[in-house]
Amino acid sequence: MNPIVRKMSPTAPSMIRMDHTLVMSHFHKLEPDTPEGVRAAVVRSICAALEIHAQIEEEIFYPALRESGVESPALQEAGPAHDEVRKLIERVRALNGQRTAQDNALHELMNAVMHHVADEETQILPAAERFLGPERLSDLGARMTERRLELVRPRAAELAADMARGAPAKTALMAVGALVAGGLLMSRIGRRRGMHL
């Protein structure tokens, strides 16, 4: 694990909570008078953020909880909840250009996400904080950050463009800067390890 990534990374629960906040803030940008180009960018951002978030949880966070003996109905339901979110994302994408139908699908997606967020933040994350301890949660956060950078890197330009379209100018510049910095960091890490990323 790269020590720079480790130092810069939030703990796993903090990262998950930040992801939840980001996605919910994107949902709140979708107003009836949102211009179509901005709306499309926000919808793409929501879908990408949810897909990346779910993949990181499934690959790193949930297995670590299970290995540590955490048992929770919410943890057992997390996989099916992610599957439901993925199906709704596909529906949202398939309805592109059909505003009313897509709005209805987005509403269903938002409800599914809110239910999952509530379960995660009231049951799964508190259990992780009780059972895993600060050092393990920091390690998981660093691994999740590294994986996020790997997943974002091939789509960085697309994600940055959507963030820029869907955000105020100051926020967009900060987001683009963060994505560029993340890409440079991953390239540097890859060179040090002798990999081409």
Give the predicted meaning of each segment.
Residues 1-197:
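Small-residue-biased structural context
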